[in-house]
């Protein structure tokens, strides 16, 4: 076992002790093989004069208070010479400023044209913040790169895809934006940041469902099989399609079938599977799940046809079509049109999906095949990967060289940003302890940089906590933590972050809070990237129940070593880690009883 752990450490993956009863070991190989090499194994040419000029200008910018002086590990990222680089950037590691300086080095010292460079950030909000930082630093460098050029450079995945969709797919409208008057068709946001279906979207899905029920007897049969209801009497007029709620095993909530179809279809496409090509009979699933998938295929075909008639596309559909056209050699997607993707810097890479990986592969394979130099810098932290329920996975970041192969025997450069400038040591160590049972992760040695103020502490569990009974005590505690932040002259913009998994829980708590208190409330997913002097968590991070259908889909897609259930068990612990690492000098966690992510803290 010691040899196995040593070998796993060399690969950057934590070995899983089978005696822990964690299910399938992480060493299980996905069926998907590495494709032919895309990236040059040769280093990017950087002269000593270029490096020296960058170091000198950074020193002047730091002296002027424009930026902080980079650490040695940050300099390694800024000056990296490899065309294919993976950066493990831990919580609070200063990656955003480092990313800005890397872009400045490329634009101002390596003379990369802004028209050949794209920086991908997670949401429109994070893009806006990154653009603002980049413009400020470029101004100090007296660069001619202006706000318009920076706006073109810094995008979400969906915004970058949208540029190609407008040029090649006929400027489609987006299904995800139906009914959203604030949405921008030219700047689509990452749907991971979005909410529930709106009325216009639900109506279109419902119409497709009703049409299938009316026109397809097999579909009708599957619907009644799934709902456990009697099919309509063939001697009588056909009733409307049933709208009773349906709960798929593994899902938390019941919903009308058309909503459940849409949710699972999004997941299926996100993990790189084309719904119409799914070999339902070959999947290792139950008869009920097979009936669900067969009905889904009929529904999805009708839904896509309805979208086409209205000039609409889903984001997933656009990624699929563009990837297929790139692979097929569509002349409208030549090297000139793709030039902006030549040099890619992608933040939050731990949250990409197989579908995004397929698109990135197709982009860079097409460019490299045309003789265009390409580079990819992927920045992420597998410890903060929390979107597996939408199809994303840290496995894609950890098995990076399989998906983004270099030519010959080359491998990606691997750099680590392990200093934590945000949280005090007790908070960091408590957060790390939560991850002890994560089956598949990159081991890191995080160093705490911030000194601990008087009264600081790691995670304090408050248990038993019943929201219905103990709300007044929680309100008093929140006020006390705001006073603590004031007493130590906290420099944080927010004194207290109130965190939970569900909006309804947070709204109930906020209803009784003094609105003048410096408190902000977010779901844990929305709080990623934020920080406050004190983090207060009001949820246990328990994994969801077993999801047999998604286990079967995970096994079929060929991208993953883990089962979906194992991925979700790991993700529930990572969610706890993300929540704790929002706190700077104190964390309080209110739970009914120690379980899930809080069990190890009790």
Task: Write out the residue ranges for each language-model feature.
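P-loop NTPase Walker
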Residues: 1-173, 577, 581
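Conserved ATP-driven helicase/translocase motor core recognized via long
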Residues: 39-42, 203-298
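Conserved helicase NTPase motor core
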Residues: 51-91, 153, 285-399, 419, ...
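Helicase P-loop NTPase motor core
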Residues: 92, 96-99, 410-412, 419-519, ...
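Conserved P-loop NTPase-based nucleic-acid remodeling module centered on helicase motor cores
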Residues: 116, 121-246, 395-398, 523, ...
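Conserved RecA-like helicase ATPase core segment
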Residues: 354-457, 580, 588, 601
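A short beta-strand element within the Helicase C-terminal
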Residues: 522, 526-555
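C-terminal accessory regions
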Residues: 545-550, 555-602
């Amino acid at each position: 076992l010691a040899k196995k752990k040593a070998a796993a450490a060399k690969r950057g993956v934590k070995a899983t002790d089978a005696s822990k009863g964690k299910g399938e070991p992480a060493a299980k190989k996905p069926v998907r093989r590495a494709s032919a090499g895309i990236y040059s194994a040769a280093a990017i040419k950087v002269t000593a004069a270029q490096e020296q000029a960058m170091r000198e200008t950074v020193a002047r910018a730091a002296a002027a208070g424009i930026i902080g002086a980079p650490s040695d590990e940050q300099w390694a990222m800024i000056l990296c010479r490899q065309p294919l680089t993976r950066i493990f950037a831990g919580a609070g590691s200063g990656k955003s400023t480092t990313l800005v300086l890397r872009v400045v080095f490329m634009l101002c010292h390596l003379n990369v044209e802004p028209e050949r460079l794209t920086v991908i950030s997670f949401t429109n909000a994070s893009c806006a913040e990154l653009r603002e930082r980049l413009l400020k630093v470029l101004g100090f460098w007296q660069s001619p790169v202006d706000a318009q050029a920076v706006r073109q450079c810094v995008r979400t995945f969906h915004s970058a895809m949208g540029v190609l969709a407008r040029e090649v797919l006929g400027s489609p409208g987006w299904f995800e934006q139906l009914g959203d008057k604030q949405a921008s068709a030219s700047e689509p946001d990452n749907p991971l940041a979005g909410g529930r279906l709106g009325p216009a979207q639900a109506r279109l899905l419902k119409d497709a469902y009703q049409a299938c029920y009316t026109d397809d007897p097999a579909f009708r049969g599957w619907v009644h099989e799934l709902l456990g209801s009697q099919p309509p009497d063939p001697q009588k007029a056909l009733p409307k399609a049933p709208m009773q709620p349906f709960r798929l095993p593994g899902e938390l909530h019941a919903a009308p079938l058309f909503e459940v179809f849409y949710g699972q279809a999004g997941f299926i496409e996100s993990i790189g599977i084309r719904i119409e090509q799914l070999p339902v009979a070959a999947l290792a699933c139950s008869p009920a799940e097979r009936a669900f998938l067969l009905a889904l295929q009929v529904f999805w075909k009708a839904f896509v046809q309805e979208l086409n008639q209205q000039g609409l596309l889903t984001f997933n559909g656009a990624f699929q079509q563009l990837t297929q056209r790139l692979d097929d050699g569509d002349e409208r997607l030549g090297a000139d049109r793709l030039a902006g993707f030549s040099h890619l810097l992608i933040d939050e890479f731990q949250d990409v999906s197989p579908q995004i990986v397929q698109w990135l592969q197709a982009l860079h394979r097409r460019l490299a095949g045309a003789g265009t130099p390409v580079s990819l810098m992927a920045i992420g932290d597998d410890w903060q990967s929390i979107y597996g329920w939408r199809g994303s996975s840290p496995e894609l970041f950890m098995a990076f060289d399989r998906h983004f192969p270099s030519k010959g025997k080359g491998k990606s450069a691997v750099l680590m940003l392990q200093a934590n400038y945000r949280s005090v040591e007790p908070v960091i160590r408590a957060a790390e302890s939560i991850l002890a049972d994560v089956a598949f992760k990159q081991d890191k040695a995080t160093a705490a940089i911030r000194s601990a103020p008087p009264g600081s502490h790691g995670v304090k569990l408050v248990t038993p906590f019943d929201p219905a009974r103990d709300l007044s005590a929680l309100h008093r505690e929140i006020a006390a933590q705001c006073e603590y932040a004031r007493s130590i002259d906290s420099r944080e913009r927010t004194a207290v972050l109130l965190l939970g998994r569900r909006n309804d829980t947070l709204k109930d708590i906020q209803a009784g809070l003094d609105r003048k208190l410096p408190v902000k409330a977010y779901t844990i997913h929305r709080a990623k990237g934020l920080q406050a002097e004190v983090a207060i968590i009001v949820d246990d991070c328990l994994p969801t129940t077993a999801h047999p259908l998604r286990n079967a889909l995970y096994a079929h897609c060929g991208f993953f070593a883990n089962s979906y259930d194992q991925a979700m068990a790991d993700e529930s612990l990572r969610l706890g880690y993300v929540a704790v690492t929002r706190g700077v000098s104190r964390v309080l966690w209110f739970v009914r009883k120690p379980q899930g992510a809080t069990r190890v803290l009790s």
